[in-house]
Amino acid sequence: MRSKERLSMSKINLYNDRFFEPDSKTRSVARELYSKIKNVPIVSPHGHVDPKILSENKYFSNPADLLIIPDHYIFRMLYSQGIDLESLGVPCANGIQIEKDPRKIWNIFCKNYFLFSGTPTKMWLDYVFKEVFEIEESPSEHNAMNVYDHIQNLLQKDNFKPRSIFDRFNIETLCTTAVSYTHLTLPTIYSV
């Protein structure tokens, strides 16, 4: 098992075949199939993106509000390791948000990023950090504020507004529902 210290300064490596079968015959078929469909527009039948984000198309306020607070995969993992939801900015059942400082929330996330090792969530986060935000090192308590500031600067640019990201990822249709800590609602379909 890799230690927290080794992970804290590790580079983000995205291996080209990370989602393909290790068996070489199967992998070659997977590569061929992927090469034929990789540029097809995305039709996403499931998601947790608040449709208001796309309809309003406002700048994201900060990295914590974008990546941590609305993502139940992230905050539930941290909660399972003893971190209070309130300290992560997740609103209470009555809608009140206890921790409102996004830098504190981000620091907790980065300090505990090593907990995501070996999970699909880390694979997704590593992709987002490296490919979307051009971050080379895994987030850690040592670089938390540098990573935060870097992302914060990008979030103030037009090409990081929700509709720009939607278009950049070639999303044609996104079916979504409310965030996981609200009452269940009917799905919303957002299409270009």
Identify the function of each model-found stretch.
Residues 182-188:
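Conserved small/polar residues in nucleotide/adenosyl-binding loops
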Residues 53, 188-189:
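A very general structural signal that marks isolated residues within well-ordered alpha-helical segments
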Residues 1-8:
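Short, Lys/Arg-enriched N-terminal segments with co-localized hydrophobic residues
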Residues 10-93:
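An N-terminal structural lobe/cap that precedes and organizes the functional/catalytic core
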Residues 38, 63-181:
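Alpha-helical scaffold segments that flank or form the walls of functional sites
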